[in-house]
Regions:
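ATP-binding glycine-rich loop module of kinase domains
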Residues: 1-28
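The N-lobe alphaC helix and its flanking beta3-alphaC-beta4 segment of protein kinase-like domains
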Residues: 22-40
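Protein kinase-like catalytic core scaffold
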Residues: 8, 43, 57, 113-115
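Conserved structural core of kinase catalytic domains
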Residues: 42-83
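Active-site beta-strand termini and strand-to-loop segments that position acidic
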Residues: 1-4, 60-61, 108
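C-lobe/activation-segment region of protein kinase-like
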Residues: 92-97, 108-141
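Hydrophobic residue at the +6 position relative to the catalytic HRD Asp in the kinase catalytic loop
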Residues: 100-105
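Conserved hydrophobic core/spine positions of the Hanks-type protein kinase catalytic domain
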Residues: 83-90
Length: 141
């Protein structure tokens, strides 16, 4: 979305049914996770405003494709994996994982940003080395 001068991301919280997980208050969870990740030093787009009644978040827009789009095009910057691992060095001691899927990352200005505000309790089977890394490989020619 735009105000005529700048672009923004307007994220609408959605409530899809899930048989194996109870989300609780998703808006409050996103806000709590944003603050947690921000305090840890995870690169995030800035949260600019919250419309609680409509469950919407207004975030800074980072121009450019996601890491997933770039990986699909055969483009993997040499430092992306190091940047994700640097995030892990902040997350794991705090007992957290993030969603390491490349659609949740946008490279901008030499920094890989995590554009989702979600984090979860650390579980080794869902950490970067055991789960996320498999999605950060270039497609076979």
């Amino acid at each position: 979305m735009t105000d005529g001068a700048q672009q923004y991301v307007l994220k609408q919280i959605h409530h899809e049914p899930c048989n194996y997980y109870a989300f609780g208050d998703k808006l409050q969870a996103k806000l709590r996770d944003y603050e947690t990740l921000r305090h840890l030093g995870i690169p995030l787009p800035e949260l600019l405003a919250v419309d609680a009644p409509r469950e919407r978040l207004l975030k800074t827009y980072l121009p450019g494709p996601t890491a997933a789009e770039l990986l699909k095009a055969g483009r993997l910057a040499p430092d992306w994996l190091a940047q994700v691992r640097a995030m892990c060095r902040l997350l794991y001691p705090a007992g957290l994982n993030i969603d390491y899927y490349p659609t949740n990352f946008v490279p901008y200005g030499g920094v890989l940003y995590y554009i989702d505000y979600e984090c979860n309790p650390y579980a080794p089977q869902w950490d970067f080395e055991h789960w996320g890394m498999q999605y950060w490989t270039l497609p076979k020619p």
